[in-house]
Amino acid sequence: MGRKEDNIEKALKIVEHTELIRNIGIVAHIDHGKTTLSDNLIAGAGMMSEELAGKQLVLDYDEQEQARGITINAAVASMVHTFQGKEYLINLIDTPGHVDFGGDVTRAMRAVDGVIVVVDSVEGVMPQTETVIRQALREHVKPVLFINKIDRLINELRLNSDEMQKRFTKIITDVNRLISKYAPQQFTKEWQVSVQDGRVAFGSAYNNWAISIPAMAETKITFKDIVEYVKNGKQKELAQKNQLHKIILNMVIRHLPDPKTAQSYRIKQIWKGDLDSEIGKAMINCDYKGPVAMMVTKIIIDPHAGEIAIGRLFSGTVKKGTDLYISGAGKGKVQTLAMMVGPDRIPVDEITAGNIAAIVGLKGAIAGATVSSLENMVPFEPMIHYSEPVVTLAIEAKHTADLPRLIEVLRDISKADPSIQVDINQETGEHLISGMGELHLDVTLYRIKNDYKVEVETSDPIVVYRETVEKKGGPFEGKSPNKHNRFYFEVEPLKPEVIQAIEDGDIPQGSKFKDKKALVELLVSKGIDRDEAKGLVCVEGTNMMFDVTRGIQYLDETMELLIEAFVEVMNRGPLANEKVFGVKARLVDAKLHEDSIHRGPAQVIPAGRNSIYGAMCEAKRVLLEPVQRVFINVPQEEMGAAINEIQQRRGIIEDMKQEGDEISLTAKVPVAGMFGFASAIRGATGGKVLWSFENAGYQKVPPELQDSIVRSIRERKGLRQEPYDADYYASM
């Protein structure tokens, strides 16, 4: 253990010097070599033995991660590296590449200022590479590039040095295209990666070597020499001359920003408070003397210590015993403070601005929470998750006595991983857990059984559907039970560009808008009429409610209740009680009783609800199902088997490319058709297949299947078989 503590000892001398700190992440498509690279960097910095690097997978410390050979949690390691005679502290966060764990990537990006993008030289830039680059750039995180598995180009594809360089050029061009597309405007040119200035490195993480143009100038090794070393089995020798960790960490220190530099442009992206306030200035300057401002990016549930909140400290100094306020959860006292190295927490007395801290004592904090020494700090912007849960399981305790424990465990799990949603089905009393895919739920169930020791039984996986409308419906009259109040709503589909702006986080959720003027301008730019935009009342999920009435008496007093009715309908659609997607509801008229006693919640909420439901019935209700884009690489002779497997699952082939004997297929497949796909595609192609996928939003269920799917959902939820029609809502 000694070397780790020594390292933390060195680190503690550096923590107050922000110019010597780098907070970095490593991102990549699944299996492109992220964790292997992380372990090499940790070994090189003396945190574990060099022989084990790449084989030990320090950051894959979860039993499941080692068994599955993929990274599931975003782990943290702090290490020290000497560059040009100075010691630097590097806080490294390893993130998962598997699409099911995208939530962890989003959270890790908030904690870091720079990122190493790893690309497999054989596969090139893949869909998940694009997703993680987009996530990093959205958080104003600066990239550098490491092209990995060069030995495969030489040994498997038999490329010479010229052919290799052609391939590198293509990868670099692809990455720069994505940077141009997604980088903040002021950085689209400045953040382009180039070989010449050393922002790109090449190598083999597994074999511990790397090379970059600045390193070539020092060692006089050329690409031709590299081909010879690899061909002749001399990669160990190559690794001694060009140590991976030195080349990569030198690149990080040279080209990725320190916390103070990064916070000068990142704070206004991630925090919408007053930048001229005391805390605003302290964060922009990364000032350790200012008030404490920290964002929790991960909660680890430790069997001994309980909840550990890990997060990025943007200003101030945290010490043992400090009282801190947690957004939405009251006050907590710092009991212990530590720096993290994979699974180990090394205790420290204090941590200053610009660092990553692990704190015990912030009870009630969740990933995404704002922690501050000020009671009323404006919270950080919520983190945008690129994918919503698409698969649900019903879960129950095997032994009734374990039920209270199961409820506690589910609460812990949803704290530690906010991309897992836990709901209780009010009708049946069963617990539902929803995640990003089959693997995500498998891993969660494994944790419940093995880490928390609760025996559970689960249903088959259930797909998460959405409801929408196809055309305009209403105005539809909704009457209150006492018949003294009437509301008239219209509904229609929301424009795709408005839905996109909501999903990107440009349009905030809820009904309290900080800068209504700017929001109106944004809506007008997306094609919404100005008068209508001014009447925006509420955003719920990807749906919006507008009030376009004029001068109706007492309406202001009932608006909160109408918002409640709207939110309820958007979370329980009229077809199958599934969430509603992409619908605009407009209140166009209302008739209200003058006596407030006759327009309380029990009158207004049902009237508003029936008006929106009725208008949706008139607007042709449609069921949407989640779809995934699937990417498959197979030898030519297995192409037929792969296409057949896709088509059996209602999939559509969108694209097909050939490179040598390899065929690359891109297909769109409903999530409902993807269960068991992994073993089926391996079986069909005799194991000769590489495949991956990403969530690709929702599409309409084929009309011939809609009725039967709606019926089966309603049956599962204990509802009457047929959905109610417009006449029913009119008669209420």
Swiss-Prot record:
Its main location: cytoplasm. One of its GO terms (molecular function) is GTPase activity. InterPro entries: EFG_II, EFG_III/V, EFG_V-like, EFTu-like_2, G_TR_CS, P-loop_NTPase, Ribosomal_Su5_D2-typ_SF, Ribsml_uS5_D2-typ_fold_subgr. GO terms for cellular component: cytosol; ribonucleoprotein complex. Residues 19-228 form the tr-type G domain. It is found in: Cytoplasm. The modification Diphthamide is found at H598. It comes from the Archaea. Keywords: Cytoplasm, Elongation factor, GTP-binding, Nucleotide-binding, Protein biosynthesis. Pfam families: EFG_C, EFG_III, EFG_IV, GTP_EFTU, GTP_EFTU_D2. GTP binds at residues 28-35, 94-98, 148-151. Belongs to the TRAFAC class translation factor GTPase superfamily. Classic translation factor GTPase family. EF-G/EF-2 subfamily. Catalyzes the GTP-dependent ribosomal translocation step during translation elongation. During this step, the ribosome changes from the pre-translocational (PRE) to the post-translocational (POST) state as the newly formed A-site-bound peptidyl-tRNA and P-site-bound deacylated tRNA move to the P and E sites, respectively. Catalyzes the coordinated movement of the two tRNA molecules, the mRNA and conformational changes in the ribosome. HAMAP family: EF_G_EF_2_A. This is Elongation factor 2.
